[in-house]
Amino acid sequence: MARRSRGRFIDGILLLDKDTGMSSNFALQRVKRFFNANKAGHTGALDPLATGMLPICLGEATKFSQHLLDADKRYLVTAKLGQRTDTSDSDGEIVQTREVNFTQEQLDTALEHFRGETMQVPSMYSALKHKGQPLYKYAREGIEVPREARPINVFELNFISLEGDELTLDIHCSKGTYIRTITDDLGEMLGCGAHVIMLRRTQVAGYPYDKMVSLKQLEELVTKADAESLSLSEVLDPLLLPMDTAVSGFKEINVSDELATYLMNGNPVQVANLPVDELVRITIGDARQFVGIGQMNDDGQLAPKRLIVLREQQD
């Protein structure tokens, strides 16, 4: 049997605009195939119902995907009022129907309850694990698992529109915030019930909305490459953002070429202006080439935490 090709060594981050009706892993595997990448990973799953920004890390960028998983997110959500479902979204079964009857003042008061730092009990229909199994698997078997409330922060919760029984909100929140849970809880506070019928992630960290690319656009570019005998690097690679954008919020520490030799071999080095208890973004030389992240050790030196493999990208 022939050895399967391991793919290209390609490093960077693609801002995928995920379509509705597909899992995040399905979208990830499609992107990996389009780029013929040897390694790929996403930065926090979107429900099949949801659309929008799903950063896909390729190659060495996967080493920093956790920092995007931990980043703030922004969503546009439309809730259908008057109906509660077992999954808190339109993929579930309706379990309760009630009349929608509240004032704008009551809505404003209810929305204020969710702003700022609060505690949230995760939905049973989530990917959080209990004894190695995702909660949603227990939920599908009718098993309720005790969950502890977790701290979340809703930085902004903006009212967009109320058209008939459909309420649209813009939510900027911390990692681990379940929009379906906010929607369900809001519906209960309003006394009518609610569930998500549209959910779109519009931002992850500071990534620009207009840089997103859909699977359809990628497919069209691959078709163009085949038709015009172009390489993948010519048509797809320009869509990738530099891998250090995943840690752009970290302080930069620039290391000389001489010290970089020690650092890249895993050794700590002495540098000036190193912050205490903070991860930093490491660059080397006058070109300020990104090589990874590090942190001060007990001796006050810069110790590498995650370093990339320096190589020329190739088809």
UniProtKB/Swiss-Prot annotation:
Function: Responsible for synthesis of pseudouridine from uracil-55 in the psi GC loop of transfer RNAs.
Active site: D47
Name of the featured protein: tRNA pseudouridine synthase B
Family that this chain belongs to: Belongs to the pseudouridine synthase TruB family. Type 1 subfamily.
Gene3D superfamilies per UniProt: Pseudouridine synthase, PUA domain
Record key words, sorted: Isomerase, tRNA processing
Enzyme Commission numbers on file: 5.4.99.25
GO biological process terms, semicolon-separated: mRNA pseudouridine synthesis; tRNA pseudouridine synthesis
TM helices/strands, residue ranges: none
Catalytic activity: uridine(55) in tRNA = pseudouridine(55) in tRNA
Keyword Endoplasmic reticulum carried by entry: no
Molecular-function GO terms, alphabetical: RNA binding; tRNA pseudouridine(55) synthase activity
Coiled coil: none
InterPro entries xrefs: PsdUridine_synth_cat_dom_sf, PsdUridine_synth_N, PUA-like_sf, PUA_sf, tRNA_psdUridine_synth_TruB, tRNA_sdUridine_synth_fam1_C, TruB_C
Top-rank EC class of the record's enzyme: isomerase
Database matches in PANTHER family: PSEUDOURIDYLATE SYNTHASE TRUB1, TRNA-PSEUDOURIDINE SYNTHASE
